[in-house]
Amino acid sequence: MTSITTSVLVLHSLLAANFKYYQSFQNGFIDMLSAMADSNSVSGLPGQLCREYTGIRPLDTFLTSCTVFFWPTFQGEIPGLSLYGIAFASAMIPMWLIIVIDVHRRRQPFGALVELIAFAGPLIQCIGPGLVMPLLLARIHTPSRDSKSASQFDYRTFIPSMIIGYILPLLLASLPAPLILSYHNKQQFIAIWQGWPLYSSVLMWAFRRRSGHVHCSRHKGLKHACIFALACSSAGHLVLLSLTWLWSLSYWGYIQSAPWNEPPLASLEAGVLRFLQWDYTLSASATLSWAIAFRHEVVQQKSLRISLLSLLRCLIGIVFLGPCSMVALLYWQTCSLQEEAGQKAPAKDKQLDQEI
């Protein structure tokens, strides 16, 4: 990555620190969360707030705060907030895929597992992708095509690990209460979902250990993983667009106001939506910027040009499929370009040897 790209990513992280956290303290949102946690109640929850999950007090305090924060999104009493949560949750899959691929390119499988569950995963889930993703992406250089550790990782394991470790807990936490789940069990599922980076990373490692060896080419496995990420992110974005239109909701409600023109918070739900808007906007923007810079770098190396039509298709995709869907597509196209160039190089060398 160039110094310009790195600077842009660091700027995204600084903006997240200001707009997400500093402004949340200034407008009273953090105080509102703390007050509800202290009073053992949360908006939309008729019963008591659950405060014991693991028996480890610091961890239980964190999970209680997560329950207070995510309850309005999972309960579904405000459709616009829940729809935005669906789009954000689905967009996390392409972002996490980029991190997983980079870690497995640099490390052996067990080392990659340790880094994901002890560093990248906790940072993303505890601090938020809006602040953390740009910094993680700034560490990534142009992916190496000939990485030895990458050849030992079957990218297809990303698919079942995310289905079981991320999507399934997310669906369980989204079940309506008290229609299907009790209020207590719903809080438990919300707390369980917080550990998805741990579950998915361990499952990837376990699936690889079980398979024993890679059954398909690395390029083909990467294609499957990118298609899965593209499908999930596109589905979440299309659900947001279509149901907003069917329910006659305003699309402008999903566009974050300028920080100097934000209305005062009237409720916890408004604060949650504002927080998620900045989190999604900055993390998706940073990841898309990284993907575009990666593609531009590879295209320049191959002495190619990016056509105006491809830029137009990218803009249309961002609007109708979502920014992170285009990240998955751009990443796959760029890796394919690298693979194609890598296959041509040995053939050219072989022809040169024959001529000599």
From Swiss-Prot:
Its main location: membrane. It is found in: Membrane. GO terms for biological process: paxilline biosynthetic process. The keyword Transmembrane helix applies. It is an enzyme of class 5 (isomerase). Residues 1-16 form the signal peptide. One of its GO terms (cellular component) is membrane. One of its GO terms (molecular function) is isomerase activity. The keyword Isomerase applies. The chain crosses the membrane at residues 81-101, 116-136, 161-181, 187-207, 227-247, 275-294, 314-334. It is a multi-pass membrane protein. Paxilline synthesis protein A: Part of the gene cluster that mediates the biosynthesis of paxilline, a mycotoxin that acts as an inhibitor of mammalian maxi-K channels. PaxG, the geranylgeranyl diphosphate (GGPP) synthase is proposed to catalyze the first step in paxilline biosynthesis. Condensation of indole-3-glycerol phosphate with GGPP by paxC then forms 3-geranylgeranylindole (3-GGI), followed by epoxidation and cyclization of this intermediate (by paxM and paxB) to form paspaline. Belongs to the membrane-bound ascI terpene cyclase family. This is Terpene cyclase paxA. It comes from Penicillium paxilli.
